[in-house]
Amino acid sequence: MLVDGKGGITTIPGLNQIQLEGFCRFIDQGLMEELSKFQKIEDIDQEIEFQLFVETYQLVEPLIKERDAVYDSLTYSSELYVSAGLIRKASKDMQEQTIFIGSLPIMNSLGTFIVNGIYRIVINQILQSPGIYYRSELDQNGISVYTGTIISDWGGRLELEIDRKARVWARVSRKQKISILVLLSAMGLNLREILENVCYPEILLSFLRDKEKKKIGSKENAILEFYKKFACVGGDPLFSESLCKELQNKFFQQRCELGRIGRRNMNRRLHLDIPHNNTFLLPRDILEATDHLIGLKFGMGTLDDMNHLQNKRIRSVADLLQDQFGLALVRLENAVQGTLCGAIRHKRIPTPQNLVTSTLLTTTYESFFGLHPLSQVLDGTNPLTQIVHARKVSSLGPGGLTGRTASFRIRDIHPSHYGRICPIDTSEGINVGLIGSLAIHVRIGNWGSLESPFYEISDRLTGVRVLHLSPGRDEYYMVAAGNSLALNQDIQEDQVVPARYRQEFLTIAWEQVNLRSIFPFQYFSIGASLIPFIEHNDANRALMSSNMQRQAVPLTWSEKCIVGTGMERQAALDSGSLAIAEREGRVIYTDTEKILVSGDGKTINIPLVMYQRSNKNTCMYQQPQVRRGQFIKKGQILAGGAATVEGELALGKSVLVAYMPWEGYNFEDAVLISECLVYEDIFTSFHIKKYEIQIHMTTQGPEKVTNEIPHLEAHLIRNLDKNGIVLQGSWVEPGDVLVGKLTPQVVKESAYAPEDRLLRAILGIPVSASKETCLKVPIGARGRVIDVRWIQKKGGYGYNPEKIRVYILQKREIKVGDKVAGRHGNKGIISKILPRQDMPYLQDGRSVDLVFNPLGVPSRMNVGQIFECSLGLAGSLLDRHYRIAPFDERYEQEASRKIVFSELYEASKQTANPWAFEPEYPGKSRIFDGRTGKTFEHPVLIGKPYILKLIHQVDDKIHGRSIGHYALVTQQPLRGRAKQGGQRVGEMEVWALEGFGVAHILQEMLTYKSDHIRARQEVLGTTIVGGTIPSPKNAPESFRLLVRELRSLALELTHFLVSEKNFQVNRKEA
């Protein structure tokens, strides 16, 4: 928070602000723009005209609440009404009605949508901005070839190329190219107009031969030639109006529509003054582009950097929703046209309401949110995850790049990203560099560019002025960096400071500085700005830390970090997990479900979240932090949320850690923990699983929900009520029935075996007319039933069966196989849980909670964890919390080391713990082995870092298979836990078994347990009857499959006997 020159306060912008501003822009401008494009519709005889009056559209407040939409699997939407008129030209009568066009999904206050009960987010897309770009490439002979690429608003491309002989070509596709003169002639210019409006007419005339003159002799000839290259597959086309119209639709409208942004970029690059409302490519654009291309050939002009952010644009949620709304209106226009003509044909009297159907807009948006790659299910693991997901920017998607074809240069960090896109936070894997995260202070400008704020430094200004500069504009200023990033405005700057100018870093005098950054975290995303001492970490480890903080599970008893960065409060406030007072008043009632506040003669009901399931099965809740009768102010926190403490983000716990090896149990990033973390619920978390079953209407009748399930043991249905649904509050174990359901079926008597029919006749058991299809608790799941919902979707389109959902709350303690991590990319798997008495203990008798491997620090170069570890120990002894801004070396050298050692020294003096700081080995201490009581040979680094429990838990991953399905082709077990698949024995696993000489185990894994069909059947029979398992006598199915594939390549694999004799080689000693 900084004070500006006018006495006001400059705060960090809302982290959801970009999403909210985009949706508001769509509601205020996008709807009007698309509705104004709706054409007047007439019948065939042009007697009746239909039109929309776009000035009077209105959106109705949603009829349901957000929480009800989630539980009932509905869409949180608003109904759109527009005035429409039907004019009869003969009598000049107009019938005007307000019609319902459809439902529009509405964004909530967190920047998300609720579609069919699921929280979804529309992320921003970064694309190449429409316009013209010049670049140079080397051909096979090492000669530079200059090209100019015109990119349309929809991603279509038209390339202009100049070869070694200075001939200019227009490349329509990758293979076909035509002369630039043919293109200009097809656009309506004759040769004289072309030569009069270019700067180099002699170059264009130099390659004009008789054959070329014939092609451009008339517009018709040019269009025919252009059509041959562009669309004609075979034959000799003749000029016609349909051919001209087809070329106009296919090429000039699809590939040459620049749009508003493209027209602006074209005017700026080619120094044109064409009006911005003229959004199509004009002959004048081609002429100027050709002149510039020829100038580049002779050393004049500059090339473009395609990866510079000034050549990129952001396609926000407003653009995506507006495109879908325009698509829905086009479909509506066609539907109204067909309905109107049908009504006139059948001599019915149409009305505006009868002509318009509301399903088109609704289904268009349902398809967009369900299928579009930029519409994603909200990652709700913790509050931070929701914010980071909304601030992602992706180069993938329609019109963008793909993970397999994007080059390294596109993925790399560009200097123009400075202050706009975080250089650290990106995806790992194939999408690295293609999915980034926006910096904290960035905003989206009117032209789709990313703007970053700077302070203007001038002697004329008495105060501080903030400028938001788009990419490219800040390159013309000297931007101070490094030690000029002081938080205090009044600090005296040095005489010489590092600065950035034209993508280069310089050292200049302070008097030459034009701009300065406004905040130390200005260049990072919210995830990276939560890492203390980030300047001491390798960038790869900082990237891992940013991603792993999003995977942290909210704990039962959260704890705010001892060492932080100061951004924790902002992240918690903008995440929506806190309940904030909207006005001042007095609390008159509070419980776990709601808070009632009275003020200004009104009573406000603030509902609280209680055991709400996120999309990642984590438990979200809110706890009141105010008392009855307490007076509150506007903006005060009323209730804390999951993973928040005192209004700050709290994702983990500060535990006592030692960096030392321990009997090999922390080898290769494994982690050793104490049993007190389990018994004291230090890393215990709650998870909510949702189980769903549908009730269908079958051909034999409806399915029945009942508690009378035949052939099931009584203890499995003990928790069902009279309706056959599990009671809320019941404790369920694997195999218990949650919903009892019977499906009717027709079973013939002949379907049973003879002995079964005889037994039924003797005992008098009737043939069952239904089949048990109950919803049961799966293997490995247990917990408490916290909610049961019976959902019937009313209305809608198509068949909507009834659904019954059961929510089960699970309590998970930390166990062997769970994953934990710090905030510096240091992650590991729990390998062993030791008794408290066996853990190493300190000189004051406290046992260590967690043991990390010290070898994980030097090679990974994430030294920031050492600073956090030691400073956390000092903070726990002194009962202090630290908020450290990054790059504190701007104040003095070794600033981080000095503050850590000074705090440790103070802790050792004030708390009577001299072991906290020992001058011989500062930061380390002598600790004792809990098993023997002896001291370890070397001093060990101990401290209290902030440790997170990640969502990668062993309960979700452990899997076993006894029987299961096999693949049809290879006859091998399927892959994956969801399919009850088997464990793959690959090449390296076979080598390991061979190394130990376990021949029988290896044979079983490659034959009986895998794809030997006959041997599998023999093993089953032998197991039932008893006896020795026979050895397989023929080849397994995978070998037979290999033989068949070789035969498909005309290769026959055969075998033959060389000799029946045994050959022995006698080796003689040398």
From Swiss-Prot:
E.C. numbers: 2.7.7.6
UniProt GO MF annotations: DNA binding; DNA-directed RNA polymerase activity; ribonucleoside binding
Pfam families to which the protein is assigned, alphabetical: RNA_pol_Rpb2_1, RNA_pol_Rpb2_2, RNA_pol_Rpb2_3, RNA_pol_Rpb2_6, RNA_pol_Rpb2_7
A GO CC annotation given for this chain: DNA-directed RNA polymerase complex
Class of this enzyme: transferase
Subcellular location as annotated: Plastid
Reactions accelerated catalytically: RNA(n) + a ribonucleoside 5'-triphosphate = RNA(n+1) + diphosphate
Main location: plastid
Superkingdom of origin organism: Eukaryota
Keywords attached to this entry: DNA-directed RNA polymerase, Nucleotidyltransferase, Plastid, Transcription, Transferase
GO biological process annotation, one example: DNA-templated transcription
Function recorded in the entry: DNA-dependent RNA polymerase catalyzes the transcription of DNA into RNA using the four ribonucleoside triphosphates as substrates.
Subunit-level organization: In plastids the minimal PEP RNA polymerase catalytic core is composed of four subunits: alpha, beta, beta', and beta''. When a (nuclear-encoded) sigma factor is associated with the core the holoenzyme is formed, which can initiate transcription.
HAMAP family, per database record: RNApol_bact_RpoB
Family: Belongs to the RNA polymerase beta chain family.
Name this polypeptide is given: DNA-directed RNA polymerase subunit beta
Organism: Cuscuta reflexa
